[in-house]
Amino acid sequence: MKKWFLLIFVSALIISCKSKTSTTAPDTVTNTATHPGWIMQGNIYEVNTRQYTKEGTFNAFAGHLDRLKEMGVQTIWFMPINPISKKDRKGSLGSYYAVADYTGINPEYGNLDDWKNLVKAIHDKGMKVLIDWVPNHTGADHPWLQTHPGFFIKDSTGQAATMFDWTDTRVLDFKNNEMQDSMIAAMKYWVTETGIDGYRVDVAWNVPGDFWKKCIPALKAAKSDLFFLAEGDKPYLMTSGFDAFYPWEMFHMMVKVAAGERPAFGLDSIKAKYDSVYPKEAIPMYFTSNHDENSWNKSDYGTFPGAAHAPFAVFTQTMGSSVPLVYSGQEEPLLRPLPFFEKDSIVFSKLERAAFYKTLQELRKNNEALSADAVFKKVKAGDEKSVYAYTREKGGKKILVILNLSKKEQPVSLTDQSLFGKANNVFKGQSETLNATAWKMEPWGYAVFSYNN
């Protein structure tokens, strides 16, 4: 859903005023996730089915699977595949996140057999499948509003409440245990009946941790290696069973660095904060764009314009403790916002960034130094206001990343003698000798070196 970051706290107050059964999540929980092994060196590619092809169907999207496999994509996350409510609908097609039926398929995309065939095709190519889930609210004409009105938070007039400007939705009440059980049953359906590999959870930050401590183990009982990604960055999510979270503060710092508003070393303060407030096993999902940022905030073409995209994309693909995300069309690249409530197909023709992403994603899949649990170490390679450098290391493998996060050419030199010697320049595909000799890195430049291969 569209992020109104400054209003998150306000939203909790509004809902609290509307009902005594607030959905405000507790901050004190105890259990942690055991990550599925397949995500540790994996990556995520977000699919906007409506806009991905002219047809906007599962069957049409299937024609892109070979291309995505070739690009190194490992996990495909589909935005909500459920039917969209018609009541209070926004635009002609409505928001993907106004769900009318938790166990139904949006007929615009196809039918259940089409979906099952697509999941099988993805699995047959060795890739994983995530679907978007919207537990915080339903669409404005979801059947539960008639059959189970007690499932919903009420406003001051006794009607099912809404949040922010999401007038096409109605907020669910997580103090209702029957609703919780119904939600878990619906989520389990997609696991047991269609074989998905996990969930990206919308507005996870407004759902209580106690629910996730109940829900996630119940789903993992059906399939033990499920992956759970929370849209949110509240620490309680990472101690309630989620594997990964949205690192919004890091993303916003990246945008400021790209705009020249903050120095490159500003990224360090966010990394230090994450290290202090999250369990060490928590996985941030780094990105330069996603469906919200593209539609509402001009990412990545506006936030990381032109050549600025590349070093920040390298950052997202190689940063410590993380899993990277690529959004539909970034490989083209997509240089416009996709409307949220109307049809506007992506045209794939140039694929100018496909080889770039392939290099990064294949490196991550094949080199355990980029595993989510590999060691991260910041190193000095130049003026730290502009040059950001670090190593990743695990199992005798080492990766060195050097980024020029500025619009000016920067001198680069290494001082750490442990980095001297032969290394493979990943993007040039050649062996080089690294030493204390300085060189110039072009504006928005980047270099990735692999040792011990």
Question: What are these language model-derived features?
Answer:
Residues 20-22, 26-74, 80-194, 214-223:
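Substrate-binding/active-site clefts of carbohydrate-active enzymes
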Residues 77-91, 132-141, 202-208, 231-236, ...:
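Short, solvent-exposed turn/loop segments enriched in Gly/Ser/Thr/Pro and often Arg
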Residues 16-41, 45-48, 53-77, 83, ...:
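Carbohydrate-interacting/catalytic domains
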Residues 4-12:
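Sec-dependent N-terminal signal peptides
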Residues 43-45, 76-78, 129-131, 199, ...:
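Hydrophobic faces of well-ordered beta-strands that scaffold small-molecule active sites
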Residues 279-302:
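Active-site clefts of carbohydrate-active enzymes
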